[in-house]
Amino acid sequence: ACAAWCGTWTGLNTVTLEAPIEARVFVPPALNLFALGAFLAGLTTMVSAGTNYRARTIGIVGGFYAVSMVLKIVGRAAPGWEWLGYTSFFTPFEPQRLVGDASRAWSVWFETAPGSYELGGIGYDSVLIGLGLAAYVVAAVVFARRDLPAPL
């Protein structure tokens, strides 16, 4: 996430644009990317704690990733299937929504209409990091109770 933001900063400072853009507006999306990475690291650790084979871990996590992506795409594209998007872990990964609106980017909750609220940038990050930490806890419990095979 830091490398992505540094690349954005470098690009903005080496290219001439019609309207100047400050690199600091890209900090919330970079933090959202970090939170997604933290969740995926926790998920992968949790799956890895329960299996002996790297290929199986990669297959399970890759399949989960692909299914989650399909669920989010179908939830956005198919009328009447919007609810399906909420079953994906990509739901709190919305870096594009955090670029243009600083009040949304730096808040836990954001009022979209009177009486209607959505998660803000900090809320998105909290959900992803919280799920990642929960996965790490599950991984620790599973690994502590697991019978490891003897070395060959």
What is each of the regions a protein language model found here?
Residues 34-70, 74:
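A structural motif at transmembrane helix-loop-helix junctions in multipass membrane proteins
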Residues 22, 26-30, 34, 54, ...:
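Hydrophobic, aromatic-rich alpha-helical transmembrane segments
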Residues 57-142, 146-150:
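Terminal transmembrane helical anchor/hairpin motif
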